[in-house]
C-alpha cells in the first residue's frame, strides 16, 4: 500500500497592477510586491520649494519679550476675568513642548496685531499653572477661552488647533 503524499502549496500572489492602482496617478502607482520605488513627477525645484515652505519660521524661545501676546499667571488671569473690560478676552492655555500650541501662537500673534485695540489676547503655560489649568478644565492643548466683555454671555471654549478664520468669526460674531 502506498502512502498518499500531501503537500501544501500556497496560492501564488497576484503581482499585476490591480484595478484600483491603475486608476491612481502614475506617480502614485506603486505595487506592494514590486521592488522598485515609486516614481515622482515633481521636479527638484518643486521639491525644494515645498521644503522651504514647510521649514519652521520661528527662531529662539517660544515666549519672547517682543510678542504682543503676553504670558500671565493664574492670579493675573483671574483679575482680568473678574475686572471691568470693554474688549473680549482670549486666553490661550499652552505648553512649550506642544507642537500645535506653537502653531497656534503664531496665529494668535497675527490676531493680536489685527485686533490690537479690539481684543485682549493672553496665554497661560499649563506646566507652570497646572492647578489653574485643571480648574479651568483644560484637558487638551491648545485650549482657548473666548470671554466676552458682556458678563451675561457664556464663554466659548475650543480645544485643539483651529483656523485663524474661525477665531476671527468667534471674536466678530459671538463676543
Swiss-Prot record:
<feature type="active site" description="Nucleophile">
    <location>
        <position position="98"/>
    </location>
</feature>
<dbReference type="InterPro" id="IPR013766">
    <property type="entry name" value="Thioredoxin_domain"/>
</dbReference>
<dbReference type="GO" id="GO:0045454">
    <property type="term" value="P:cell redox homeostasis"/>
</dbReference>
<keyword id="KW-0676">Redox-active center</keyword>
<dbReference type="GO" id="GO:0015036">
    <property type="term" value="F:disulfide oxidoreductase activity"/>
</dbReference>
<keyword id="KW-0150">Chloroplast</keyword>
<keyword id="KW-0813">Transport</keyword>
<keyword id="KW-0809">Transit peptide</keyword>
<dbReference type="Pfam" id="PF00085">
    <property type="entry name" value="Thioredoxin"/>
</dbReference>
<feature type="active site" description="Nucleophile">
    <location>
        <position position="101"/>
    </location>
</feature>
<keyword id="KW-0560">Oxidoreductase</keyword>
<keyword id="KW-0934">Plastid</keyword>
<dbReference type="GO" id="GO:0009657">
    <property type="term" value="P:plastid organization"/>
</dbReference>
<feature type="domain" description="Thioredoxin">
    <location>
        <begin position="74"/>
        <end position="175"/>
    </location>
</feature>
<dbReference type="GO" id="GO:0015035">
    <property type="term" value="F:protein-disulfide reductase activity"/>
</dbReference>
<feature type="disulfide bond" description="Redox-active">
    <location>
        <begin position="98"/>
        <end position="101"/>
    </location>
</feature>
<feature type="site" description="Deprotonates C-terminal active site Cys">
    <location>
        <position position="92"/>
    </location>
</feature>
<comment type="similarity">
    <text>Belongs to the thioredoxin family. Plant CITRX-type subfamily.</text>
</comment>
<dbReference type="GO" id="GO:0009507">
    <property type="term" value="C:chloroplast"/>
</dbReference>
<feature type="site" description="Contributes to redox potential value">
    <location>
        <position position="99"/>
    </location>
</feature>
<dbReference type="InterPro" id="IPR036249">
    <property type="entry name" value="Thioredoxin-like_sf"/>
</dbReference>
<keyword id="KW-0249">Electron transport</keyword>
<dbReference type="InterPro" id="IPR044182">
    <property type="entry name" value="CITRX"/>
</dbReference>
<protein>
    <recommendedName>
        <fullName>Thioredoxin-like protein CITRX, chloroplastic</fullName>
        <ecNumber>1.8.-.-</ecNumber>
    </recommendedName>
</protein>
<keyword id="KW-1015">Disulfide bond</keyword>
<feature type="site" description="Contributes to redox potential value">
    <location>
        <position position="100"/>
    </location>
</feature>
<comment type="function">
    <text>Probable thiol-disulfide oxidoreductase that may play a role in proper chloroplast development.</text>
</comment>
<feature type="transit peptide" description="Chloroplast">
    <location>
        <begin position="1"/>
        <end position="73"/>
    </location>
</feature>
Amino acid at each position: 500500500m502506498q502512502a498518499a503524499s500531501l503537500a501544501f502549496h500556497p496560492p501564488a500572489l497576484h503581482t499585476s497592477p490591480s484595478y484600483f492602482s491603475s486608476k491612481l496617478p502614475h506617480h502614485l502607482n506603486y505595487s506592494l510586491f514590486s521592488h522598485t520605488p515609486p516614481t515622482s513627477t515633481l521636479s527638484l525645484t518643486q521639491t525644494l520649494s515645498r521644503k522651504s515652505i514647510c521649514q519652521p519660521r520661528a527662531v529662539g524661545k517660544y515666549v519672547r519679550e517682543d510678542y504682543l501676546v503676553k504670558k500671565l499667571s493664574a492670579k493675573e488671569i483671574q483679575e482680568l476675568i473678574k475686572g471691568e473690560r470693554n474688549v473680549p478676552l482670549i486666553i490661550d492655555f499652552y505648553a512649550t513642548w506642544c507642537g500645535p500650541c506653537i502653531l497656534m501662537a503664531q496665529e494668535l500673534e497675527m490676531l493680536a496685531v489685527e485686533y490690537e485695540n479690539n481684543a485682549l489676547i493672553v496665554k497661560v503655560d499649563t506646566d507652570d499653572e497646572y492647578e489653574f489649568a485643571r480648574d479651568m478644565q483644560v484637558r487638551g492643548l491648545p485650549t482657548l477661552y473666548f470671554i466676552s466683555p458682556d458678563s451675561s454671555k457664556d464663554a466659548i471654549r475650543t480645544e485643539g488647533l483651529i483656523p485663524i478664520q474661525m477665531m476671527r468669526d468667534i471674536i466678530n460674531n459671538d463676543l
